[in-house]
């Protein structure tokens, strides 16, 4: 059985760096054996601008060892911009639309961002399921 593809938003990586238990648990070996974590270049860029990372650049290497870097889905991106004005009205930053385009074919988008979750409800497919780290861990636990 193929592992679920799990896209991590920047806020989840920030909570990981700050030691929040649910986000830290996502990087535990037992979870990594069950899912494939992913980010895109936008999330990586946002991560590089954090003070914690500037002071300790080796953190990025540790994260990159555990995630897959996804490309942008340009077809999805074009659909979102053309057909989903509601998304543009909800999201403050165009980076979020780029994040949605990369996460479009993932099974889960893990975020604490309520606006991103609301914007994803305007998408035309059932993927990804937008959850918090706690919700993802609970779902994985229920599938054991």
Q: Would you name each region that the model predicts?
A:
Residues 71-122:
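Active-site neighborhoods of divalent-metal-dependent phosphate/nucleic-acid chemistry enzymes
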Residues 8, 24-54, 69-72:
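PIN/NYN-family metal-dependent endoribonuclease catalytic core
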Residues 1-22, 39:
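Metal-dependent nucleic-acid phosphoesterase active-site entry motif
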Residues 13-18, 48, 85-92:
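Short, flexible loop segments at the rims of nucleotide/cofactor-binding pockets, characterized by
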Residues 69-75, 129-133:
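Short acidic-hydrophobic, aromatic-tinged amphipathic segments that line or gate anion-handling sites
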Residues 1-3, 110, 114-144:
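Acidic, PIN/NYN-like endoribonuclease modules and their adjacent C-terminal/linker elements
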Residues 13-14, 44-47, 116-117, 136-137:
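A generic structural signal for short hydrophobic patches within well-formed alpha-helices
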